[in-house]
Amino acid sequence: MCIRDRIVAGGWYFYTSSEIQVSDNLTLGDAIQPGIPKATLILAGNNKQSLTPTYPTPVKVNHSTTAIAQNGALIYPTTPNTNIDSILKQRSEVIENNTLTTEQGNEFRVTFEDGTTVHLNYNTELRYPVKFSQTKRMVYLKGEAYFKVAQDTRPFYVITDHGTIRQYGTEFNVNTFSPERTEVALVKGSISIIPTKSSQEQFIKPGQLAHIEQKNNNISIHNVDLTPYIAWNEGRLIFENRTLENIVEILEHWYNVDISFGTSELKQLRFTGNMDRYATISPILKAIA
């Protein structure tokens, strides 16, 4: 059977951009591959470079710095904060920003000059200086990213549309996909959160999930099992009592497919599951079909 641009499975309709020969709908799921490590690096002057697993290793990120692109990650050369020669040199340089962006069906990693690592999920934008200042480390995030912040005397700030997260050395996930709130899951260490339109500052502890609400600038903190919120960073797709509508939204972004429902009633069905994020979409179809 030849199906073009539509796959039907359990009342779901999957749209792809190519024609695929299949014997049944679940077999077609084997042809839909997961996301890949790919990103666009935007340099000063809006110059853009595409980063893929096959991209040449050296990447000139400004006039004096060359990063290394390898295995789906961009790695900046380390600059020890205690090196006096480096400090004096930095004071005479203009701080330049780089921006790393991922699209639907993509992910990427970056290691900053201080040793901090960030894993960008799909549809994410991260803006940061090539070298941090001597007093603070500050980045700007839209989308979702998992941070492992290197220990340093300088505070590390993540700026989002809804608020600012501050820490010194810790591990956490930030999700800004919802226009209504920013979600922060703290794995290790301690962080504080300040809403954009407020001076209110709240600290959260490991194992807590915080929501920064756009409507009223309130911060709500919950003690939860963080596993479903950080599973994507560890190569899993974990859903706990999630609606099919919510699951479909995640699958669309990661597998780069468009999905619609045979009936609106299907959207509110709830599922719990634990899947390999790097497998084809077929196991998920079989689990919920």
List the predicted regions and their residue ranges.
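Conserved small/polar residues in nucleotide/adenosyl-binding loops
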Residues: M1-D5
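A residue-level detector for the "anchor" residue at the start of short, highly conserved motifs
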Residues: A9-A289
